[in-house]
Amino acid sequence: MSGIWGWFGGGSAAQKRKDSPKNAILGLRTQLDMLQKRERHLQNQIDEQDAIARKNVSTNKTAAKQALRRKKVAESTLETTLGQITTLEQQINAIESANINRETLAAMQAAREAMGKIHGKLTPEKVDEEMAKLQEANDLSNEIATAITSANIGQPIDEGELEDELEKLQQEEVDSKLHETGGSIPVHDKISLPAAGTGALKGKEKAKAVVEDDEEEELRKLQAEMAM
């Protein structure tokens, strides 16, 4: 139907402009096909007249000359036809190139319009502004995460209570060792001692025993001298 309406002037002007190169190329190709057929026909005539002239060159010179005349006419017509074919081919190529250029330009314009719609009112300044806001949001998120993970949730620990618990554990250890050696100390007489104080106490007791032995020896010597 669109083709019929086109013959009678129907259809939009834009559609006509779009179809104009195609119609021109179609008409040129039709004419080119006809000229190529004519080229083959003329070439056949030339070959045929050349054969007639060769056949009658010795027996019938008149017929040979007529054949050569027809051959010359066909060659002249063929030369003109070949020129027309070359011209049509050039025109077809020119129109096709122009049409391709137009379609390429139209595609580029459509791409530009699409990019314009995608970007809208977006500008490099707005992009920088949004990126800065995004960085601020990320920094705030990191600060919040740090505050949450570093917060000491619950009651604060009393260091004094920890020291009391440590002394109780040390006293229990001392009591356990005394129980193993058979000794006993009343609960109210127990003294909280440092874990490292036991060795020092034993050293002091040993030194005291040595001093007492020396004193006893000196006392015995004095008694012997008085007895004399």
Swiss-Prot record:
Which keywords, in A-to-Z order, does the entry hold?
Coiled coil, Cytoplasm, Endosome, Membrane
Give its localization. Answer: Cytoplasm; Endosome membrane
GO molecular function annotation: identical protein binding
Instruction: List S-S links within the chain.
Output: none
Q: Name one GO cellular component term.
A: ESCRT III complex
Parts forming coiled coils? 25-94, 125-226
Annotated membrane topology: Peripheral membrane protein
For this UniProt entry, what is the primary localization, expressed as one broad class?
cytoplasm
One BP annotation, GO: peroxisome organization
One Pfam annotation reads: Snf7
- Report the Gene3D superfamilies cross-referenced here: ESAT-6-like (1.10.287.1060)
Give the similarity note. Answer: Belongs to the SNF7 family.
Role summary:
Required for the sorting and concentration of proteins resulting in the entry of these proteins into the invaginating vesicles of the multivesicular body (MVB). Also required for the proteolytic cleavage of the transcription factor pacc-1 in response to alkaline ambient pH.
Quaternary structure? Answer: A component of the endosomal sorting required for transport complex III (ESCRT-III).
Q: What name is this protein filed under?
A: Vacuolar-sorting protein snf7
Organism equals: Neurospora crassa (strain ATCC 24698 / 74-OR23-1A / CBS 708.71 / DSM 1257 / FGSC 987)
Q: What gene is behind this protein?
A: vsp-3
